[in-house]
């Protein structure tokens, strides 16, 4: 993602030429916002009276937001864990796949009870709660990384 690299380069320059894994995250702020907007647009326009292309636009925005969020998070994990980045990335992917496997178990009843609009609104609020971790990681990520019992840069 060239735009993410520009954010990273700017923050490295501003930090005296030293990069930090947290500098990969700013693009995720934009991505999580687009993800939430896309899911809300999809949910509230997925009705038979509304032209089919409108919820498709919501899906496209949601997909772009997902990519703009997941790529910086993956780069953050790789930069944070050094030589252990493959294992850490695998752990993140397993978590994503587990969520993807569990969601269909309750999605049908969620949308049947709440309808698409309110069901997607609930999901957007859950995304908002999860998205709050990005600014926390950006601000306190270095202190959080220093809490772990080992330093990957030593190995």
From Swiss-Prot:
InterPro entries: MFS_trans_sf. Keywords: Membrane, Transmembrane, Transmembrane helix, Transport. The chain crosses the membrane at residues 25-45, 50-70, 91-111, 118-138. The keyword tRNA processing does not apply. It is found in: Membrane. It comes from the Eukaryota. GO terms for cellular component: membrane. The keyword Glycosyltransferase does not apply. It is a multi-pass membrane protein. SUPFAM superfamilies: MFS general substrate transporter (SSF103473). Belongs to the major facilitator superfamily. CAR1 family. This is Putative uncharacterized transporter C977.04. It comes from Schizosaccharomyces pombe (strain 972 / ATCC 24843).
